[in-house]
Amino acid sequence: MYRYKITFAYDGTNFSGFQIQPNKRTVEQTLKNAVNKIAKHPTPAIPVIGSGRTDAGVHALNQVAHFDIPYHLSNESMRKALNSILPLDILIKKAELVDNDFHARYSAHRKTYRYRVDQGEFVNPFKRNYTSHFKYPLNLEKMRKAADDLVGTHDFTSFVASGSQAKSNVRTIENITIKRDEVRNEVVFDFTGNGFLYNQVRIMVAFLLEIGSNQRPVDDVSRVLKAKDRTLARMTAPASGLYLVNVDYGTNDEKD
């Protein structure tokens, strides 16, 4: 068997998330269908293993998955073959033959997510599926100061949605940047960490927006982290503004 790592982008608007669900259009099922078509529909079907799940409406710029296939194709042939089958809202950017010990989920070292907030007076119909909307003035310095308290290793119980299957809510956030995109009239958040809990990024964004709009004090992060109480960070930002930007494996896994 030959193991391939694929790096791909998708528009999450018309997907019910990444993970396979009965009678739902998902990214995982769509990829699985394409891979099994290339492999001439073996039994049992070939699974596609992603680096992690994204929810309905969440996008990806560089999601990663792997699969094992009984036929050898060059990297470029595999990329082109998949793209010839896949719908237009998924694009395979790179296909790589890798060692069999590579695992899209367990080999990952860190991930980066981006969240885009449109600051227009009204919702832009052409951006509504790709940003969230917050028209009120935001103090970026206050949000940056608060974000510093999220960086590091913490128990993020207050920032995880119900339904999480994680065994531990301890995660490490390495970096958070908050910038204003003057051209697009957006505020852009980037979060890099060793992994993120269910809805964690969207909850943190909503929390920081409350601080930036003076609905919370700047030092509220520490209090809420220590409390380990989800009701203290009650809001969740919409899925439409969230993007998986990068999955870092720390090494070059591609085989010659």
Swiss-Prot record:
It catalyses: uridine(38/39/40) in tRNA = pseudouridine(38/39/40) in tRNA. The active site is at 55 (nucleophile). One of its GO terms (biological process) is tRNA pseudouridine synthesis. Gene3D superfamilies: Pseudouridine synthase I, catalytic domain, C-terminal subdomain, Pseudouridine synthase I, catalytic domain, N-terminal subdomain. Disulfide bonds: none annotated. Its EC number is 5.4.99.12. CDD domains: PseudoU_synth_EcTruA (cd02570). Keywords: Isomerase, tRNA processing. Pfam families: PseudoU_synth_1. One of its GO terms (molecular function) is RNA binding. It comes from the Bacteria. Substrate binds at residue 113. Homodimer. Belongs to the tRNA pseudouridine synthase TruA family. Formation of pseudouridine at positions 38, 39 and 40 in the anticodon stem and loop of transfer RNAs. This is tRNA pseudouridine synthase A. It comes from Limosilactobacillus reuteri (strain DSM 20016) (Lactobacillus reuteri). The lineage of its organism: Bacteria, Bacillati, Bacillota, Bacilli, Lactobacillales.
